[in-house]
Design a protein with these regions (language model features):
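N-terminal strand-loop-strand beta-hairpin
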Residues: 1-100, 145-172
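Structural motif
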Residues: 4, 68-69, 112-116, 127-129
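General "foldedness" signal
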Residues: 22-24, 109, 118-120, 132, ...
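Intrinsic disorder/low-complexity signature
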Residues: 34-35, 61, 116, 126, ...
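Hydrophobic, well-ordered secondary-structure segments
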Residues: 42, 115-116, 132-136
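Conserved, surface-exposed functional patches that form binding/active-site neighborhoods
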Residues: 84-125
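Mixed-charge, glycine-accented linear interaction segment located at domain edges/termini
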Residues: 123-155
Length: 172
């Protein structure tokens, strides 16, 4: 059986500075920050019944489409019958401590808000439910306060339907 990786993406209710301070207080350092513009294209007529992962796999993502070569890719996709479905801009802040194999990502996503994303390769061999619980427990050890029954926000499904959509796994 193929292992499936869980990534949690939890919507946050306080401001960015609050969580930056929490992470710093708990020994993490900001190691990266950027602004990213992604445009997604698909040939799908509808995403009804699709999971976050299925939507992402059915799309072609062009990252930072301002570059000349990406403008040509976009023209070709449109000629091949693809349609633009999502146009997202996010600010990304990555945090890590020396002993972490992965990064905690704080993202401000246009039309969604502030979200924390996290996965951990140490948990990949566990069941989906166990991975999720371990990830939330670990996030809580860094100053967050999530309940293990709380669902994460699905970015693409939320953008698709124009309302917040939640599930147990935000791995796209």
């Amino acid at each position: 059986m193929e292992n499936f990786v869980v990534e949690v993406g939890m919507k946050l209710d306080k401001n960015l500075n609050y969580y930056k301070k929490q992470l710093k207080r708990n020994g993490l350092k900001q190691i990266f920050k950027c602004t990213t513009h992604d445009i997604y294209f698909t040939k799908e007529k509808s995403f009804d019944g699709f999971s976050e992962n299925q939507i992402k796999k059915s799309c072609i993502r062009i990252r930072n489409p301002q570059k000349k070569e990406d403008k040509l890719k976009i023209e070709n996709l449109l000629k091949e019958g693809y349609r633009k479905v999502f146009d997202t801009i996010k600010k990304d802040y990555h945090y890590q401590s020396k002993d972490m194999k992965s990064r905690i990502q704080l993202q401000i996503i246009k039309k969604i808000g502030l979200v924390v994303y996290y996965d951990n390769p140490d948990y990949y061999n566990f069941s989906l439910d166990k991975q999720r619980k371990l990830l939330l427990k670990e996030l809580n050890s860094y100053g967050f306060s999530f309940n293990t029954n709380e669902l994460g926000i699905d970015k693409l499904r939320t953008l698709c339907y124009g309302k917040e959509m939640f599930s147990k796994n935000q791995n796209g």
